[in-house]
Amino acid sequence: MFRNIVDGFKGLVDVAGANYSPYSVQNVKIEDYKSMSKRLEDGHLILYKKHGCYDCVVVGTPVKMWSLFRLTSDGEAVAQFKLISSKLNILIARSSSLLLENNLQKATDVIREHHSWTPIHIAAYLGLYEFFSQPDILSKINDKTTTTEVTPLMVAITGSQLQCTEQLLKNGASLYMQDNSGETAYHYAVKHHPKCIPILSQFDRDSIKDFFNGKGQTALFVACEKGLSEAVEQLLYAGAEPNVTACDLLPVHIALKTNNMSNIELICEKFPDQLFAKEKKYGGTLAHWARNRESVEKLCKLGCDVNIMSDTGHTPLHIMLKKNRGECIMELLVYGADTRLGDTDGNTPLHLAVEKDDIELVRLFIIFGADVNTQNRKNETPRHLAAVSKKKNRDVILYMLHISGGRRCRKNAHGCLKGCVMEGNYNGTVDDTMQHVMTLDREAILDDMFSSFEDFDQDVDTSNFLRKHRVLCLDGGGIRGLLLIQMLMAIEDAAGIPIKDCFDWISGTSTGGLLALGIAMGKPLPYMKGLYVRLKDEVFKGSRPYPAEFFETMLKKELGETKVMTDIKEPKVIVTAVLADRHPSQLHLFRSYHPTLQTYQDENQPKDRLVPSPPDEQLIWLAARSSGAAPTYFNQAKAFVDGGMIANNPTLDTLTEIHQYNCGLKLRNEGHLVKPIGCVVSLGTGRIPVTSVQSVNVFRPEGILDVKRLVNGFTALVNMMVDQATLSEGPPVDRSRAWCSMLNIPFCRLSPRISEDFPLDCHDDKSIIQMMWETQCYIVANKAKIDKVGKLLRSIYDVKNV
């Protein structure tokens, strides 16, 4: 009775095990099976029937036995037994290492999952490399399965068996074999174990690594499609060719499509021509296929051509417009995309922006140099398209084109309306911001009537200027240095010569100092404009104060890591900074020349106080870093902080320096080298709106309600002190103007009115475009003034270069 109960309980346990873990390999005791009946037996395997289930065991040695599965169905148990025994017996006979619990588990799992695999395939997958040293096995080393047609080599790679893979290749495994999808061992290595690729390449004599699968894809293409950087790197090192494909796309294109920039970088570093490779369908390059700002930035840094044409006649800028990828448009422009290039219909990006009725894009393209009078193949200008448009923004866009120089259509033009017809006088509608800026600029023109700028109106004898200095002074202002660049580009256009050749002295503070150095080193203004826009993303990272290493890396790259100030020969450059390790603080001038007057050091000064390096030892990038070390934005550079703390408008300091330079020449009996100042051009980074301040009172509070008034008053007082310390408009301009007027020196001050106080570290693209557009409006309003400056500078240049 008791024995029956125990047997019944064991039966229940066996059935439960058969239901919940039927295929887990378990170490069992031989004595537990002595009283059981055998259902089947084949070699090392026996199928027992016990307590309502069927138990398949493998006998390894007289004392070791493992249960492979436990099933309740007779038919299923018999089928599994025959499937496993037909393969496992062969494996056990040739590889004793299989007789371990883990190995048996792997082997039985593989047999159940891959019915068509032969013992050779299973041995390859499990890494039983000793299995392949026997002659009868070697004759079947390239056998394919009946279903997927995979070879033992492919299976070994799938199982990540490096040693077995190498053993198979040494014993004659063929790399030419392909499965029913056309995939080679390389394709399998890409998907399953890239570390096998170097082993495969050692036995590859015919560039099988570049074979296509059934889809026309090489192993490199598949690696790029799946974003497998290790596989891409291994294939490139093994000699894979990125130009080989039977698809429309090359590996680099599919890598970009999957947004894997690391793979693109790997390919393009080894094969730079892939930056310009064209896909077959449209003939587009990587620049055409970019989908986000980060992709464009990386491609541009790698050296792609942002103006390359596709086979359909489109630049990357045209494609980004059609795909509405605004961030990509901005990034392309920053890296030099040409807004004047047309597509097959002759439409420039400005034409397309007008057709899209997009005010922001119209502004953007005008700011970045679009020709507002270019005609497409239908002889239509952007102004004509705006005039005949029926969309809601047509009137504002028409006015934007008008003030940017957009001319009316010719008399023989067809389909014109009042906004573009030759005899018309309608020029569109001014939006509120433009109206405000243009009105304020008219006030600025009246303001200049009281300056010595009137001298530019006279017929100047330019020969008198041959022995006079032409001086350019650039204010500080962070990202608002873009406004300086726009005005300089306008002057450059008016003069018709590079801005570097227009001046003998260039000075700058902070952002103006960086710009002065860039100009003196021959960097084009459009390049500097792109650099400044990139600066907001590459330098202003995180929160204030920003890490200086990004700023310093950029400066070293752009200005040179080892170049010193005296490497700049012409024009002479002055960059301002403040020595903050002493009280009172002291203005310091970084010069590209040696001063003619000796500066004497106080013998009693502390030994640890910084002594600035002479010009022939002063690194250029460090001078720019020191001048731009704005408090709360960046940590100080050694003892230096931003020059704007004393000379945010460096005009008077520059004039003083030139006067002292001439005095020094006279003291050295070099009076023949003395040149007086001939003209001064001073550029500012914008005049912000005047706002109300309630109070600057700081007092002892008598009650809790006074605390808020105290805080507000203290904040206003601090702001006022900072504003006055960094003042660049108003009194500094008036003093400079008066200084020049008294000496009969032509003086020109340009500084646009802007609609808001844009922060020095502004990140927002829309805000940046807005202030650049307002500067464009200012340039248009002051065109006559700028033209006179350009005319004078060009006249002097022509006389000097006769």
Regions found by a protein language model. Give the residues of each.
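Ankyrin-repeat inter-repeat connecting loop/turn
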Residues: 109, 141-143, 175, 208-209, ...
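Ankyrin-repeat boundary/linker signal
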Residues: 112, 144-146, 178, 211-212, ...
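Extended, amphipathic alpha-helical scaffolds
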Residues: 187, 287-288
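Conserved catalytic cores and adjacent C-terminal regulatory segments
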Residues: 3-135, 155-168, 175-180, 188-192, ...
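Start-of-repeat signature of ankyrin repeats
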Residues: 116, 148-149, 182, 216, ...
